[in-house]
């Protein structure tokens, strides 16, 4: 089957065509991504209205390029998939409305894809991976540990109770005066820094649940930076190194607990899988290798270009759902919030947070 995928949930405008074979293997025929980094850099972060307008301006051309590169005409499509959330609602509306128009005109099935599900299923696009497996999803908006039991069948084992991991990296970068996007800047600065200079907290370490918390660590970095005047490049490197080291240790601890919870409830996972933009961080990849080795499980991380937001992951999730007989009507709503695990609740004691969304 051939599926067109459209991604517009944040600041990447993307479209792709993916072919799913009868045996479950896949071939990416095209994958066009246009980042809006230049549009948002002057503001130090994503501006929702600017993002939505950029999607409007670029999406038609990107879809045309993806279709041309794939060599597939619209009549040959088995389905058209769009990220229907969670995300910035203006952008979600742009992508989903476009997909509905294509589905209507060409009488093609519509698949409204949960953006998080697309990340969760990406490892099956790049590897011959069977269910169940344990997913570590870390991005600018989400940090979760999820049991992936099948297409449409997910159980959240842990989540952040405050900041998402990518969000924390970006905020630390901004407070230290590093350019946007901040995550890669922090990683580069940390490589030249002394991680032992500052004794930053390791949040949630040793707790029996698998939840994350990063706001306290972020505040600790701000406090240390505020004591240094002037803030020199060496200081920035050391602060970034200390911050990243704390994140790595906390992540390893939280994932260790998450894997234990997975085994208790679902048996041995076929793999530990990482997805989301933060999974492109090489230091975090190294920490995940250690976690997988200690847990005696295989580690699978898609290529960096498929960890960040892209159209191929949406097309693939659409193909997986289509193969399972899961399609949507033209009434499918755009969603700013959309839980991957519909039965998930906020962690105990954190009912008033945005945890898990």
Swiss-Prot record:
It is an enzyme of class 2 (transferase). Its cofactor is Fe(2+). Substrate binds at residues 137-141, 170, 183, 281. GO terms for cellular component: cytoplasm. Keywords: Acyltransferase, Cytoplasm, Iron, Metal-binding, Transferase, tRNA processing. InterPro entries: ATPase_NBD, Gcp-like_dom, KAE1/TsaD, Peptidase_M22_CS, TsaD. GO terms for biological process: tRNA threonylcarbamoyladenosine modification. It catalyses: L-threonylcarbamoyladenylate + adenosine(37) in tRNA = N(6)-L-threonylcarbamoyladenosine(37) in tRNA + AMP + H(+). Fe cation binds at residues 115, 119, 309. Binds 1 Fe(2+) ion per subunit. Its EC number is 2.3.1.234. GO terms for molecular function: iron ion binding; N(6)-L-threonylcarbamoyladenine synthase activity. It comes from the Bacteria. It is found in: Cytoplasm. Required for the formation of a threonylcarbamoyl group on adenosine at position 37 (t(6)A37) in tRNAs that read codons beginning with adenine. Is involved in the transfer of the threonylcarbamoyl moiety of threonylcarbamoyl-AMP (TC-AMP) to the N6 group of A37, together with TsaE and TsaB. TsaD likely plays a direct catalytic role in this reaction. Belongs to the KAE1 / TsaD family. This is tRNA N6-adenosine threonylcarbamoyltransferase.
């Amino acid at each position: 089957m051939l599926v067109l995928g459209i991604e517009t949930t944040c600041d990447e405008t993307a479209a792709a065509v993916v072919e799913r074979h009868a045996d479950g293997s896949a071939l990416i025929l095209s994958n066009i991504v246009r980042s809006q980094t230049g549009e948002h850099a002057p503001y130090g972060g994503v501006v929702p209205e600017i993002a939505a307008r950029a999607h409007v301006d670029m999406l038609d051309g990107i879809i045309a390029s993806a279709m041309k590169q794939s060599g597939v005409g619209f009549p040959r499509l088995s389905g058209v998939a769009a990220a229907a959330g969670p995300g910035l609602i203006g952008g979600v509306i742009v992508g989903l409305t476009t997909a509905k128009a294509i589905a209507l005109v060409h009488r093609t099935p519509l698949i409204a894809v949960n953006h998080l599900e697309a990340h969760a299923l990406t490892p099956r696009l790049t590897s011959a991976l069977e269910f169940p497996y344990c997913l570590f999803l870390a991005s600018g908006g989400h940090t979760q540990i999820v049991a992936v039991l099948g297409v449409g069948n997910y159980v959240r084992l842990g989540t952040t109770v405050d900041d998402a991991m990518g969000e924390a990296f970006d905020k630390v970068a901004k407070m230290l005066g590093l350019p946007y996007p901040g995550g890669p800047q922090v990683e580069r600065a940390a490589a030249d820094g002394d991680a032992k200079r500052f004794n930053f907290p390791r949040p949630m370490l040793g707790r029996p649940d698998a939840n994350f918390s990063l706001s306290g660590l972020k505040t600790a970095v701000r406090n240390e930076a505020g004591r240094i005047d002037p803030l020199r490049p060496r200081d920035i490197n050391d602060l970034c190194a200390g911050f990243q080291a704390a994140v790595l240790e906390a992540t390893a601890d939280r994932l260790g607990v998450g894997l234990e919870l997975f085994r208790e409830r679902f048996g041995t996972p076929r793999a530990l899988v990482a997805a989301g933009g933060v999974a492109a961080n090489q230091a975090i990849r190294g920490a995940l290798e250690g976690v997988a080795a200690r847990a005696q499980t295989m580690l699978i991380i898609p290529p960096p270009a498929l960890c960040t937001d892209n159209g191929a992951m949406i097309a693939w999730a659409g193909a997986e759902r289509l193969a399972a007989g899961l399609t949507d009507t033209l009434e499918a709503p755009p969603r700013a919030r959309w839980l991957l695990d519909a039965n998930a609740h906020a962690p105990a004691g954190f009912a008033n947070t945005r945890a898990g969304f």
